[in-house]
């Protein structure tokens, strides 16, 4: 209806994870009813190769934790994905691989990226506008 806002998902600059939950449970927390655990686990394994999807957050490295947050944002329903410094803490290889997955899974949704690294914005290479 007119005036309604479409839902969006977000990766915050600071971690917003449920520490006592598994990586898989953190991803599923906002997924809609059409996302099953096996699909979420497959995305986690794509973004975080070798991850134990049942591992608690304290067992994961900072980069792994960051990619769990990105997986959650990509699985959440909505017309937009907001990423605030999403690649912080990722090494170059993980950053490149994660960027590719983000691009592959946007599926027509709007992406709003906040970053201090112009290379991140250029790597996503889908920008209509880049503001410095």
Predicted regions span which residues?
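ABC-family nucleotide-binding domains
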Residues: 84, 91
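Conserved ABC ATPase signature
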Residues: 56-60, 64
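Conserved ABC ATPase "signature" region
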Residues: 37-52
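Hydrophobic anchor residue at the start of the ABC signature
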Residues: 70
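Helical segment within the ABC ATPase nucleotide-binding domain
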Residues: 95-107
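Walker B catalytic motif
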Residues: 56, 85-86
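Q-loop/switch helix immediately C-terminal to the Walker
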Residues: 14, 20-33
């Amino acid at each position: 209806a007119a005036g309604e806002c479409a839902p969006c998902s977000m990766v915050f600059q600071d971690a917003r994870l449920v520490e006592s939950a598994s990586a898989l449970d953190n991803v599923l927390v906002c997924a809609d009813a059409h996302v099953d655990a096996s699909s979420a686990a497959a995305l986690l394994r794509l973004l975080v190769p070798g991850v134990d999807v049942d591992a608690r957050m304290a067992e994961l490295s900072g980069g792994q934790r960051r990619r769990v947050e990105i997986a959650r944002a990509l699985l959440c329903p909505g017309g937009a994905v907001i990423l605030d410094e999403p690649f912080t803490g990722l090494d170059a290889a993980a950053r490149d691989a994660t960027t590719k997955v983000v691009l592959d899974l946007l599926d027509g949704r709007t992406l709003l990226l906040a970053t201090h690294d112009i290379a991140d914005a250029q790597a996503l290479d889908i920008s209509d506008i880049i503001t410095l």
